[in-house]
Regions:
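Short beta-strand "acidic-cap" motif of Rossmann-like dinucleotide-binding folds
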Residues: 70-75, 267
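Glycine- and aromatic-enriched mobile tails/lids
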Residues: 10, 19, 25-46, 60-63, ...
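Core beta-strand elements of the Rossmann-like FAD/NAD(P) dinucleotide-binding domain
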Residues: 43-46, 218-228, 405-406
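An anion/pyrophosphate-binding glycine-rich loop and adjacent beta-alpha core
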Residues: 257, 263-376, 380, 443-450
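Conserved redox-cofactor binding core of oxidoreductases
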Residues: 134, 140-220, 232, 274-283
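Glycine-rich Rossmann-fold phosphate-binding loop(s) that bind the pyrophosphate
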Residues: 52-54
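N-terminal Rossmann-fold NAD(P) dinucleotide-binding loop
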Residues: 57
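Conserved N-terminal glycine-rich FAD pyrophosphate-binding loop of Rossmann-like flavoproteins
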Residues: 77-110, 116, 276, 283-288
Length: 621
């Protein structure tokens, strides 16, 4: 069995519209051709352009459509084949189905605690307060949520949470959520354009009013002229060698585009390394870093080192395997580094002590995946190691509106920073997409001026368009000796070596030096093929990844403490003076980093923080 790819079979499985319906919807935004030297490009004029077709982008588009606005959603892959589908274990909402004492204030308090209080408190409270309604909405739209015997929406344990609040569909929750959102979007006839890669936002220095890109199948250039642009294109975990994303997603597209357009980025030094990624040397390199859902531990899975010791008893005797992800990931990393890992460079995750039928019911995708690799997880352990999984840092926004500070540009989902602080609570990523996605959609609909978008490009926009297409054409014609994929691999190795789970000043500075050398090698880039080739896509990804990786290294060097997912071995303690966000902007071609104070939670959430809740996970034994 191979990892899922971006084939049409998977797209149909996830609810891709029929060709007839898709064609009818697409007619709303006709292409007009215009010359750029010898190139031809299409001009598409939706009032709102949503860049990114995962759960966040879909939820924004649904809200816009329900408000009478005609958005256009574009994605890099086939319709339905977004990174959301890899979020397996669940989505948080304080429903109290099993633990009636749970409520949104405790959800918010847990989120702030696990974010080490670098979160935007308002963003946290908006998410926690919205989620019960958003889950019930998804349920009404047909999401096949697991139920208790008495018909309530079921909830499971996830790490570092005071109560059982993670709603789920087996171990395919993200896939089920995206299917549901796509179905709802299709009911509203939301237009969608697949296999489009955006390379630049249309900006005159004061306002963003569209984007430039190309169709990855035909190579044709595309200009999107819009009143408002929403970035919902994910994070940048794929700048690491071991990552849970696919190689052509989460390369930092959205963050690099926003930075170039004048927006600020926040907290890029915080990258979540999920404790349990697959070990490539054991299962095949194509599986290296792929996620083993936290639901395995949530259902009672235990971690053992090669000596047979259940080592989390030493690191976290109370919460054990269900401590926060940063704690468990560092513990696994330490076991491997100290020589107690397996021969393949991992540790063992074992759920074979649970009833086999129960495991098959609750974790069907994990059972199927490992069976295809000759492993029965109901009978034997699997081998896991940390993997770059999620980026807490991203675009700096006002969460009430999605505004970035650049007129016409909004952002949402993993693209942004603020909800998760220094470490993300499992189950909160899917929660943020729909909770904040709805709010952003509402605001953009309210902000949209009446009338259609002017299909004519301004002189400034036309100049930006021409420069960008000429740059893309030059990139496609590059005939040097270094393949883009080679440099991408070198960058990912660099980031794993110098900015991974454990960091120090020397490693970070060495990483910046190696990155500068990589930039110099791009002068000898050779792209095999035209704009329809994977080599060309890798070259574009490389440009985004270099920008974001350099920014992340600089911010990690700036933060001289350890907090959450950012662990400096030369500054191993958390420093109360560093309870501050780092904000970066591009000024005259240079990165400018500044500090910004963190807000305080509301009185009700502060009371929940002071109360303190701690669940005894030992009943899972």
């Amino acid at each position: 069995m191979s990892p899922p790819s971006s084939g049409t079979d998977r797209s149909r499985e996830l609810g891709r519209p029929s060709d007839t319906r898709a064609a009818g919807v697409a007619e709303r935004f006709d292409d007009a051709s215009g010359p750029v030297d010898d190139l031809e490009y299409g001009v598409v004029t939706p009032p709102v352009l949503v860049i990114g077709a995962g759960a966040a982008g879909a939820r924004v588009a649904i809200e816009l459509a329900e408000s009478g606005v005609d958005p256009l959603v574009i994605g890099k892959r086939d319709h339905g084949d977004a990174h959301t589908t890899w979020a397996a274990g669940g989505v948080n909402a304080a429903l109290g189905s099993l633990d009636e004492a749970d409520d949104w204030t405790i959800h918010a308090a847990d989120t702030l605690n696990e974010g080490h209080h670098l979160n935007d408190p308002e963003a946290v409270e908006l998410t926690a307060r919205e989620m019960p309604a958003r889950i019930r909405e998804l349920d009404e739209w047909g999401m096949d949520l697991d139920r208790t015997a008495d018909g309530k929406i079921n909830q499971r344990y996830f790490g570092a949470q005071s109560y059982r609040r993670t709603c789920f569909v087996g171990d395919r929750t993200g896939e089920a959520m995206l299917e549901t959102l796509i179905d709802r979007a299709q009911e509203l006839e939301v237009p969608y354009r697949e296999n489009v890669m955006i390379t630049r936002l249309l900006s005159d220095g004061e306002r963003v009013s569209g984007a430039v890109g190309f169709d990855v199948e035909s190579g044709r250039g595309l200009v999107f002229r819009s009143n408002h642009v929403v970035l919902a294109a994910g994070g940048f975990s794929a700048v690491y060698e071991r990552h849970s994303s696919r190689d052509d997603e989460n390369n930092g597209d959205a963050q690099a585009l926003a930075l170039e357009a004048g927006a600020s980025l926040l907290d890029l030094e915080f990258v979540q390394f999920h404790p349990t990624g697959m070990v490539g040397e054991r299962y095949g390199e194509e599986w290296d870093g792929r996620l083993v859902t936290e639901a395995v531990r949530g259902e009672g899975g235990r971690l053992y080192n090669a000596e047979g010791e259940r080592f989390m008893e030493r690191y976290s005797p109370d919460q054990m395997e269900l401590d926060a992800r940063d704690v468990v990931a560092r513990a696994i990393g330490r076991e491997i580094e100290d020589g107690r890992g397996t021969e393949y460079g991992g540790v063992y995750l074992d759920i074979s002590h649970r009833d086999g039928d129960y495991v098959r019911e609750r974790l069907p995708r994990m059972v199927e995946r490992f069976e295809s690799l000759g492993v029965d997880i109901t009978e034997e352990p699997i081998e896991v190691a940390p993997t770059a999984h999620y980026t807490m840092g991203g675009v700096d926004v006002d969460f009430r509106t999605g505004e970035t500070g650049v007129d016409g540009l909004y952002a949402v989902g993993e693209t942004v920073a603020g909800v998760h602080g220094a470490n993300r609570l499992g189950g909160n990523s899917l929660a943020e997409t729909v909770a904040i996605g709805k709010l952003v959609g509402e605001h953009v609909a309210d902000a949209l001026e009446a009338g259609d978008t002017d299909p004519e490009l301004t002189d400034d926009q036309r100049a930006v368009t021409e420069r960008e297409f000429q740059a893309l054409e030059s990139l496609a014609d590059a005939d040097g000796d270094v393949a883009p994929r080679t440099l991408l691999a070198a960058l990912r190795e660099l980031m794993w070596d110098h900015a991974g789970i454990l960091r120090d000043e020397d490693e970070l500075r060495d990483g910046l030096e190696r990155l500068a050398a990589l930039r110099e090698r791009t002068a000898d880039l050779g792209v095999a093929g035209d704009r329809t080739s994977k080599s060309f896509e890798y070259a574009v990804d490389l440009s985004f990844s270099l920008t974001v990786a350099e920014t992340m290294l600089q911010m990690a060097l700036e933060r001289t403490e350890s907090r959450g997912a950012h662990h400096r071995t030369d500054y191993p303690e958390t420093d109360k003076e560093w309870r501050t966000n780092l904000v970066v902007s591009a000024e005259d071609g240079e990165l400018a980093i500044r500090r910004r104070g963190v807000g305080e939670p509301s009185r009700s959430v502060q009371e929940a923080l002071e109360e303190g809740y701690e669940l005894d996970y030992h009943h899972l034994e």
